[in-house]
């Protein structure tokens, strides 16, 4: 849930991890985390929406000045791990936020011949 909330959001918004603590990025990160928690529950993992969102906030606070690995990939114009994170959530359940984040990053990758 943490990676789904932080990585794609920071990569697309071009912000450090702490940027997901403020709106509107916090809304996107929290929604992606909630969808991921739902996918986890459907797979038998006990993860509440509240716990997933709290984990995103805790990691974002602890790593506020850090650049996520996905944002680092974007900066270096490398293919990202979006398929394994947000894409995986969107494949398992109806997850419009994760699907949108994955779609936007995949479009960015295609435009650079990375996929």
Per-segment meaning from a language model:
Residues 30, 34-115:
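NAD(P)-dependent Rossmann-like dehydrogenase/reductase catalytic/cofactor-binding core
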Residues 1-38, 64-65:
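Active-site-proximal catalytic alpha-helix in oxidoreductases
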């Amino acid at each position: 849930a943490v990676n789904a909330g932080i990585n794609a959001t920071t990569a697309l918004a071009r912000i450090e991890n702490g940027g997901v603590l403020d709106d509107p990025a916090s809304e996107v990160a929290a929604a992606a985390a909630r969808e991921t928690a739902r996918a986890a529950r459907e797979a038998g993992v006990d993860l509440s929406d509240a716990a997933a969102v709290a984990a995103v906030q805790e990691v974002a606070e602890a790593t506020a000045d850090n650049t996520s690995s996905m944002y680092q990939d974007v900066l270096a114009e490398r293919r990202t791990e979006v398929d394994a994170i947000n894409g995986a959530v969107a494949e398992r359940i109806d997850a419009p936020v994760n699907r949108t984040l994955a779609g936007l990053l995949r479009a960015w990758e295609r435009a650079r011949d990375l996929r």
